[in-house]
Amino acid sequence: MTENKVESNSYLTFKVGEEEFGAHVSQVLNILEMTKITEVPKTPDYMKGVINLRGTVLPIIDTRLKFGLPETEYTSNTCIVVMDLDFNGDTVHIGAIVDEVLSVVEIEKGQIEPPPSIGNRYKSDFIHGMAKVEENFVMLLDMQQILSNTELSEISGKAENQPV
C-alpha cells in the first residue's frame, strides 16, 4: 500500500507596503515589537541601525527600502522579524522591519508557482515563488538571498563594532 504524502511548509506571512510576503519559519527566529534603533554611520540607506537583543548587537534593515519602496512609517503593527541566515557557514541574525505580521500558514509544495518573469517590481532572485493563500497572492521570499554575501558582511561587521 502506498501512502500519498503531501509535503507542506510553514511560512510566516507579513505585509510590506500593500504586498503580502512569506518567509519559511525555519528562517524566522523571533518577532519583536518596534524599539529604539541606534543608527550606524556610513551604512546603506536600508540599514536602519542596530538594537540590543539579549546582549547581542542585532543589525536592523528596513524591508521597504530594500525592496525599493518608500521608507516605513511606523505604526502599532510595525515590528521586527528576526531572521536566522547562513553566511559562509556561520549563522547571522538580521532584524527586518515589516509593516505587519499576519499569520503562519501551511503551503503545500504543489501550490507554489514560480515568480513571474515580467511585471514584478522586486528582484526575482530573492522571491522563491508565489502561492495563493485564501484570496491573496503571497510572495515567498528566500531570505538568504535578500542580502548578498557582501551586504551581509558589511552589515554584520559594522553592527559588531557598534555600542548599543
Regions from the language model: what does each represent?
Residues 1-164:
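An acidic, low-aromatic, low-complexity terminal/linker signal
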